[in-house]
UniProtKB/Swiss-Prot annotation:
GO cellular component, one term: plasma membrane
Annotated disease: Leukoencephalopathy, acute reversible, with increased urinary alpha-ketoglutarate: An autosomal recessive disorder characterized by acute, reversible neurological deterioration during febrile illness. Patients exhibit reversible leukoencephalopathy and increased urinary excretion of alpha-ketoglutarate.
Gene from which this protein is expressed: SLC13A3
UniProt intramembrane annotation: 423-443
A GO biological-process term: transport across blood-brain barrier
Protein name as it appears in the record: Na(+)/dicarboxylate cotransporter 3
Stated pH dependence: Optimum pH is 7.5.
Extracellular side: 38-55, 104-137, 251-278, 358-372, 483-505, 568-602
Family: Belongs to the SLC13A/DASS transporter (TC 2.A.47) family. NADC subfamily.
Keywords, sorted A to Z: Cell membrane, Disease variant, Glycoprotein, Ion transport, Lipid transport, Membrane, Sodium, Sodium transport, Symport, Transmembrane, Transmembrane helix, Transport
Disulfide-bonded cysteines: none
Membrane side Cytoplasmic: residue ranges: 1-16, 77-82, 159-229, 300-336, 394-422, 444-461, 527-546
Length: 602
């Protein structure tokens, strides 16, 4: 028995290598079960899907496999694969990442966060609302992981002020391995700094203590449960609102940009999705979901009942709220007066958002109509604005300097240096996006998309509204266990083909699939933000499952509502567009041999 256990441990420790070596062998039958080109393409896609789900290779390294495998297997020449990694969509995302880097460089995000918390008040349910609003707003422009990692230390400081000392933590023996595994699972290279900060702060303030309820009566179970719930409510609201906020803008999360890139690959004539049209659709959905999520989390953890805020607040709680208010005010004052660099970055950030929104908002002519049609994309706007960051001075310019020959002749630092951008921009995401676009191009060129469409024939009788609901549920479930980026890369080609089969607007199915990838609330391993919050040690898996189950359900229902109401007007979803009709004509007009092989397989 001991030998068996030792062997199992050996296998587990080498699991990534085993997956790496044996997956290609296990997938070999796929190559021979389909027509040659489609079979080889499906082999590559399934191989990448397994590697992404198991992380046998780093996600970004797996995304590079099409560069090697597509040319070797005769699916796509190298000169068609490599450009997919640097489409204009990638540059739009890169510009968003660089803008986020400048915001973080000058601590503008922290100033915004503390200001919002000062405005909403310090009652627990209101503070949870403030946390959620702040995190979701930041997540619209920063990465979900960065927003969560930035907000957690703020939440930690507020909670310690509310309760005087340390929150009663769960038994450290419980699920300690899950905490570690959750962090490792998502490869959070930015997390240790924040987690070390949280741990070191608590350790310094209270060495050797595990529970010091100085401010609350030791014999009061209700008070103990109250503060434990408040702690959980704070921590669980931050990753959830980060995931929700990322859906509101095209640059907020990677799946949104993958949708844009794959639309251009499958339907080159499609121009209805851009920053402005997406914001008009997704921002109201985000607000509704944020409100529903806040009510649910506040009901569970924040003292909110069906009759409003619970009354009979003790003097202890009143004093705790006064301390929290003082901590927030002190943290804000520690930032000092607003610097010139902060003002400059804020103005450029506003220009970035406004110009992207007004380029071609669809309901009115945008400023892009002043130029040659089709020449300008959102990438042009994004790159133009972030370029300014690298030469605009971080200190207020002065005319006197030119005439004062005694003044020091030192070069003023720009708002953002390239060295800083290199250090803070997650370049791996750019490669991951490119891998998704290369995969979509391979599906299109090999005819695999047509084969997939044939397999979806039994679904032609499914009502479109029901299809939207089913798609969102399936993808939301799948993304609980796999990266949302990998999930949408795998599913979007299938959804595009299903839309053609159903003769419905492709966006009617592709948008729910894309947004549904962000509805991963039930498990610590679902997203990096979930893992960060879980690794703090105050949450149990059952807390996330209990809270996240209804969050998932609300997200699915609200998304279905959006797709069948205002999205119909924004994207003209009630009609089958000409650009999709052209695609269906092109894919059915196949060479006779390919058509025969495909339908023989069916």
């Amino acid at each position: 028995m001991a030998a068996l256990a030792a062997a199992a441990k050996k296998v587990w420790s080498a699991r990534r290598l085993l997956v790496l070596l044996f997956t290609p062998l296990a997938l070999l039958p796929v190559v021979f079960a389909l027509p040659p080109k489609e079979g080889r393409c499906l082999f590559v896609i399934l191989l990448m899907a397994v590697y992404w789900c198991t992380e046998a290779l780093p996600l970004s390294v797996t995304a590079l496999l099409p560069i090697v495998l597509f040319p070797f297997m005769g699916i796509l020449p190298s000169n068609k694969v490599c450009p997919q990694y640097f489409l204009d969509t990638n540059f739009l995302f890169l510009s968003g990442l660089i803008m986020a880097s400048a915001i973080e460089e000058w601590n503008l995000h922290r100033r915004i966060a503390l200001k919002i918390l000062m405005l909403v008040g310090v009652q627990p349910a209101r503070l949870i609302l403030g946390m959620m609003v702040t995190t979701s707003f930041l997540s619209m422009w920063l990465s979900n992981t960065a927003s969560t990692a930035m907000m957690l230390p703020i939440a930690n400081a507020i909670l310690k002020s509310l309760f005087g000392q340390k929150e009663v933590r769960k038994d450290p023996s419980q699920e300690s391995e899950e905490n570690t595994a959750a962090v490792r699972r998502n490869g959070l290279h930015t997390v240790p700094t924040e987690m070390q900060f949280l741990a070191s702060t608590e350790a310094k303030d209270h060495p050797g203590e595990t529970e010091v309820p100085l401010d609350l009566p030791a014999d009061s179970r209700k008070e103990d449960e109250y503060r434990r719930n408040i702690w959980k409510g704070f921590l669980i609201s931050i990753p959830y609102s980060a995931s929700i906020g990322g859906t509101a803008t095209l640059t907020g999360t990677a799946p949104n940009l993958i949708l844009l890139g794959q639309l251009k690959s499958f339907f080159p004539q499609c121009d209805v999705v851009n920053f402005g049209s997406w914001f008009i659709f997704a921002f109201p959905l985000m607000l509704l979901f944020l409100l529903a999520g806040w009510l649910w989390i506040s009901f569970l953890y924040g003292g909110l009942s069906f009759r409003g805020w619970r009354k009979n607040k003790s003097e202890i709680r009143t004093n705790a709220e006064d301390r929290a208010r003082a901590v927030i005010r002190e943290e804000y004052q520690n930032l000092g007066p607003i610097k010139f660099a902060e003002q400059a970055v804020f103005i450029l950030f506003c220009m970035f958002a406004i110009l992207l929104f007004t380029r071609d908002p669809k309901f009115i002519p945008g400023w892009a109509s002043l130029f040659n049609p089709g020449f300008l994309s959102d990438a042009v706007t994004g790159v133009a604005i972030v370029t300014i960051l690298f030469f605009f001075p971080s200190q207020r310019p002065s005319l006197k300097w030119w005439f004062d020959f005694k003044a020091p002749n030192t070069e003023t630092e720009p708002l953002l240096t390239w060295k800083k951008a290199q250090e803070t921009v997650p370049w791996n995401i750019i490669l991951l996006l490119g891998g998704g676009f290369a995969m979509a191009k391979g599906c299109e060129e090999s005819g695999l998309s047509v084969w997939i469409g044939g397999q979806l024939h039994p679904l032609e009788n499914v009502p479109p509204a029901l299809a939207v609901l089913l798609i969102t549920v399936v993808i939301a479930f799948f993304t609980e266990f796999a990266s949302n980026t990998a999930t949408i890369i795998i599913f979007l080609p299938v959804l595009a083909e299903l839309a053609i089969r159903l003769r419905v607007h492709p966006l009617y199915l592709m948008i729910p699939g894309t947004v549904g990838c962000s509805f991963a609330f039930m498990l610590p391993v679902s997203t990096p933000p979930n893992s960060i919050a879980f690794a703090s040690g105050h949450l149990l898996v059952k807390d996330m499952v209990r809270t996240g189950l209804l969050m998932n359900l609300m997200g699915v229902l609200l998304l279905s509502l959006a797709m069948n109401t205002w999205a119909q007007t924004i994207f003209q979803l009630g009609t089958f567009p000409d650009w999709a009709d052209m695609y269906s004509v092109n894919v059915t007009a196949l060479p006779p041999t390919l058509a025969n092989d495909t339908f023989r397989t069916l």
